[in-house]
């Protein structure tokens, strides 16, 4: 993309590299309180609920079963971790849910055409069912 390795995207890339090369992958979901785990489940549900209800329920159950190996990570626009959580309005904020199967990634950037307006780059992936491989079966 136009933003690659320039401006705010370079800052997000730097934060992503710092998170992925660190000794920790983030906060283990199974170590969170029940209420905090419910927030992770709600975030994942936003994506899987695009499927029919039977498929969505199956996927969500599989992802929840993997919470003992699922991590949540984020860096704020300053490039620092905050126990208060990510600032979902600030340019440069990066967030990720990474489990045995589920991968959700969100990066916030200022616009190129519309300056000063933050927009979101988001991605959802099921590592076992890429490209609808076996999901239909």
State what each model feature region is.
Residues 1-137:
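A cross-kingdom marker for long, charged
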């Amino acid at each position: 993309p136009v933003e690659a390795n320039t401006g705010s995207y370079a800052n997000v890339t730097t934060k992503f590299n710092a998170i992925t090369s660190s000794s920790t992958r983030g906060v283990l979901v199974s170590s969170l309180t029940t209420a905090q785990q419910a927030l992770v489940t709600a975030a994942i549900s936003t994506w899987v609920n695009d499927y029919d209800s039977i498929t969505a329920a199956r996927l969500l159950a599989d992802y929840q079963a993997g919470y003992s190996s699922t991590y949540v990570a984020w860096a704020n626009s300053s490039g620092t971790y905050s126990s208060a959580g990510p600032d979902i309005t600030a340019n440069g904020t990066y967030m990720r849910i990474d489990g045995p199967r589920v991968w959700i990634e969100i990066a916030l950037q200022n616009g190129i055409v519309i300056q000063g307006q933050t927009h979101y780059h988001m991605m959802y992936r099921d590592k076992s069912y890429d490209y609808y491989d076996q999901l239909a079966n």
